[in-house]
């Protein structure tokens, strides 16, 4: 059984960083957001890379389209492989006006091999309320070729730049409002209060009230319009508390961590790996050891891992586990178990 032994002395308090940030970077205005749009259509003009005859919905869609053009044909009689059924999606930005252009994403839902060279037929795009907000149409782009872009790796999805035309606006009236609400991107009582204190100090009057860890209510000054007020608010710097965070992509095995995130004492076993983290000052370097970095050494005889002077951090742990041949899946499982046991105080975010 492989053993990993960490010996360290350090403060184990939760590490929180204080930094300056614009309010616009940490909070958004409630009600001012993108809106998802979706539609269904056909991409035509493919070079025999479209849906086959097993995609019955594609054949039915072709028949329906032809019928709308006064051409009567049964789905069973259609043999074309130059057409693909697709889902069409887009984001309608806040304050988008009728006639504005938006980008369109096209994704195959049948067994098409590629959408390269295809043209999306006119597609109504609807919101969650079922109303049509935009129309999409145009040539589909699937990126680069010869392994240099997204085209070769994922040819069944593509983009149409400026391929959508806004037909209906979403009404957002900020100008006539006296109050608006800010929503913090990450809930944090300290940051909510920091916005309140910063704005009230800046305007020398109470214009902001922290309602909870995510919400701050704003009242515009009497000598400004709401638009002028918000334009100023978004550019004001505040003291922003950033808690340490470990980001894990379970699909790719990618782990992103700050270098100073400490690990509290713990003893755990994962498969054939035993991890023991204890407090001990100035441990002796084991005989026959190999240096991992300036803080850690591995005892080659027993596959034990030691720290020298300094602290045991997530970054040290990950590097050391890699030295011992642990897989990304093993490392992710170990970090998740440590977080559950309270050995890691940083936020663990899975994506």
UniProtKB/Swiss-Prot annotation:
Quote the cellular component terms of the Gene Ontology held in the record: bacterial-type flagellum basal body, distal rod, P ring; outer membrane-bounded periplasmic space
List the signal peptide residues.
1-20
> What are the record keywords, sorted?
Bacterial flagellum, Periplasm, Signal
Keyword DNA-binding tagged: no
- Give the location in the cell: Periplasm; Bacterial flagellum basal body
A GO biological-process term? bacterial-type flagellum-dependent cell motility
* Single GO MF annotation: structural molecule activity
Top-level lineage group: Bacteria
> Which family is this sequence assigned to?
Belongs to the FlgI family.
Q: How does it assemble?
A: The basal body constitutes a major portion of the flagellar organelle and consists of four rings (L,P,S, and M) mounted on a central rod.
Q: What is this protein's function per UniProt?
A: Assembles around the rod to form the L-ring and probably protects the motor/basal body from shearing forces during rotation.
| UniProt protein name | Flagellar P-ring protein
Species this chain originates from: Sulfurimonas denitrificans (strain ATCC 33889 / DSM 1251)
Lineage of the source organism?
Bacteria, Pseudomonadati, Campylobacterota, Epsilonproteobacteria, Campylobacterales
């Amino acid at each position: 059984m492989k053993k990993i032994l960490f010996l360290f002395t350090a403060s184990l308090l939760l590490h929180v960083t204080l930094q300056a940030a614009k309010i616009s970077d940490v909070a958004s205005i409630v009600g001012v957001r993108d809106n998802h749009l979706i539609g269904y259509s056909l991409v035509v003009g493919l070079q025999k890379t479209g849906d086959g005859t097993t995609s019955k919905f594609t054949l039915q869609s072709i028949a329906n389209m032809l019928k709308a053009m006064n051409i009567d044909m049964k789905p069973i009689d259609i043999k074309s492989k130059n057409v693909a059924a697709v889902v069409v999606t887009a984001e309608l930005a806040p304050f988008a006006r009728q006639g504005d252009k938006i980008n369109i994403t096209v994704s195959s839902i049948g067994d098409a091999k590629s959408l390269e060279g295809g043209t999306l037929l006119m597609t109504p795009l609807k919101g969650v309320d079922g109303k049509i907000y935009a129309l999409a149409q145009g040539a589909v782009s699937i990126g680069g070729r010869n392994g240099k872009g997204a085209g070769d790796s994922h040819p069944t999805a593509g983009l149409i730049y400026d391929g959508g035309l806004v037909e209906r606006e979403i009404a957002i009236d900020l100008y006539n409002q006296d109050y608006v609400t800010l929503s913090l991107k990450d809930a944090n009582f300290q940051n909510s209060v920091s916005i309140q204190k910063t704005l009230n100090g800046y305007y020398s009057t109470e214009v902001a009230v922290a309602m909870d860890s995510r919400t701050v209510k704003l009242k515009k000054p009497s000598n400004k319009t709401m638009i002028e007020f918000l334009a100023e608010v978004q550019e004001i710097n505040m003291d922003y508390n950033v808690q340490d965070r470990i980001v894990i992509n379970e699909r790719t095995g990618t782990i992103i961590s700050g270098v100073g995130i400490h690990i509290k004492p713990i003893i755990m076993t994962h498969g054939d790996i035993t991890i023991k983290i204890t407090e001990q000052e100035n441990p002796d370097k084991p005989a026959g050891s190999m240096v991992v970095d300036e803080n850690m050494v591995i005892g080659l005889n027993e596959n034990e891992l030691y720290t020298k002077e300094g602290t045991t951090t997530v970054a040290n742990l990950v590097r050391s586990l890699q030295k011992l041949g642990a897989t990304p899946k093993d490392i992710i499982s170990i970090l998740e178990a440590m977080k559950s046991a309270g050995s890691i105080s940083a936020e663990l975010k899975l994506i």
